Amino acid sequence: MKHLRRSHTIGRREFIKTGALAGLGVGLATLTGSASASVPPTPRVRRYAPLGRTGMKISDISFGADQLTPSQEDLVHHAFDLGINYFDTAETYAGGESETALGNALRGKRDKVFLTSKTLAWPDTKKGEIMQALEGSLRRLQTDHVDVYFNHAVNDVARLKNPEWYEFAETAKKQGKIRFTGVSGHAGHLIECLDYAIDTGKFDVILCAFNFGQDPHFYQHLLGGFDWVARQPGLPRVLEKARSHGVGVVTMKTLMGARLNDMRPYERGGATFAQAAFRCVLSHQNVDALIISMTSRESIDEYLGASGSQRVQAEDLPLLEKYARLNGTSYCRNACNACEDACPAGVAIADVMRTRMYAVDYGAMRMARDEYAMVARNAEACLSCSAKPCAGACPHGLKIDALTAPTHRLLTSA
């Protein structure tokens, strides 16, 4: 109890709250006092974390460039000036403009930063096609190598069994075009894919969805229910497995939908929901760092307010609980996939809801439409469906049948 530097006694309800984070390794011993007790320090990176066995030490809160365009290069400069040294992009982000913007903004700084990019390598993708994708990324990034090259958004182990990927990786490493390889994912077969990737011994980094709502202890104690990780108890195990194998762990989707405006009325004493969510993720002993979409100077400053925090603060818990209560039944836990078999037409419901999140919650319409265009079984069938077989399929109360058809219209309209 001495670690909880509070001016008043902890009541039973708050004691339960602190215990709720035990599953993340952030119980009473790691709770700190109020952030409002002193003037907040100037935002900047305050911790550089070893990324698994790679030897890289990266900013604990790093730059997600999924929405970056050439008109926003100043954001990259601002982030760099505040100490961010890890920049994550992909060939598909902003139609390639994200890589172009990073290449322009980081010209002359390449030896001071780590760059990652990604490509979608399918079960039948050839080595030469992957190499061609990499070389396109290198041109746009204006560099001769990337530090980590990811097989992007993997949700099918068959994509990890393609020998062409491993032949490509070996050649690209020998040529000095990539230093390390990774796998990223955030969908229903995440655990299976990460397990396989780690077991191969050929992936150096994993990038996966992880947020405070994915800890069963949080929901069990605070809300009397479970989030999807309780349906997939392998996630904490896989993160621990990655750590034991020297595989670096970077997390994304750390804001559980990122509905930040919902929380502004409840933020007090300088602490914000985003900072609380980041502290929760970074306090997990098997997480090295997180990436987050950085779309304004103000958001970068806000996010970096949580850098260096490997402990959850006392005022974080009410914010996390409030967010979960406000959004628990309207947020799609993409990797839950409990609804997978509900649609006789095979609509990829979780992917449809994920792209809706990009559009409605993130305000990233371009990214949402680009991602939706890649969903093999989108919600077009929902336009003519009257039976609504998906109604009630979400164990968390998401009204799937009322959202899929409008999402299709939203993301395909001219």
Q: Predicted segments — roles?
A:
Residues 10-31:
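N-terminal export leaders
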